[in-house]
Amino acid sequence: MAHIEKQAGELQEKLIAVNRVSKTVKGGRIFSFTALTVVGDGNGRVGFGYGKAREVPAAIQKAMEKARRNMMNVALNSGTLQHPIKGVHTGSRVFMQPASEGTGIIAGGAMRAVLEVAGVHNVLAKAYGSTNPINVVRATIDALGNMKSPEMVAAKRGKSVEEILG
């Protein structure tokens, strides 16, 4: 299901799903393929891409290009999350919380692929509602994007990090 390879720029690329879709026209059906991929550097940068083409390799290539263009930074805390977070996209809801060292990535399917390439090593995660891979990936990236480090919170409130952490 999840395909991984290393690129020259040390980006991890994972293929999450390939689908055959069809368009019905007067003369019959026209088939094409869609590919969903995630790309990350394993150190807090992650992006996803969705490509569509008449052939599978072309769809995967388009998805990888889009994923590399749409990368974002995630504030990680030594291989885990900063705090429990929720993410939503259409019918998919995801919940993720930090885990202690040695726990591993406890997450299903598409969410696991996103967390692996982002550089998260210990996390407890659960997907609720729709488990459509596209929606789960978008919800996971939404949640990771909403995560705030203590430094970010302190800067926003105009306080020191020690005051924030208590």
UniProtKB/Swiss-Prot annotation:
GO MF entry, a single one: structural constituent of ribosome
Pfam families: Ribosomal_S5, Ribosomal_S5_C
Subunit structure: Part of the 30S ribosomal subunit. Contacts proteins S4 and S8.
Protein name: Small ribosomal subunit protein uS5
Lineage summary: Bacteria, Pseudomonadati, Pseudomonadota, Gammaproteobacteria, Enterobacterales
Family: Belongs to the universal ribosomal protein uS5 family.
Function: With S4 and S12 plays an important role in translational accuracy.
UniProt-listed NCBIfam families: rpsE_bact
Domain S5 DRBM: 11-74
A GO CC annotation given for this chain: small ribosomal subunit
Domains (record comment): The N-terminal domain interacts with the head of the 30S subunit; the C-terminal domain interacts with the body and contacts protein S4. The interaction surface between S4 and S5 is involved in control of translational fidelity.
Swiss-Prot/TrEMBL keywords: Ribonucleoprotein, Ribosomal protein, RNA-binding, rRNA-binding
Top-level taxon in the UniProt lineage: Bacteria
GO biological process: translation
SUPFAM superfamilies in alphabetical order: dsRNA-binding domain-like, Ribosomal protein S5 domain 2-like
Keyword Cytoplasm: no
Oxidoreductase in keyword set: no
InterPro entries: Ribosomal_Su5_D2-typ_SF, Ribosomal_uS5, Ribosomal_uS5_bac-type, Ribosomal_uS5_C, Ribosomal_uS5_N, Ribosomal_uS5_N_CS, Ribsml_uS5_D2-typ_fold_subgr
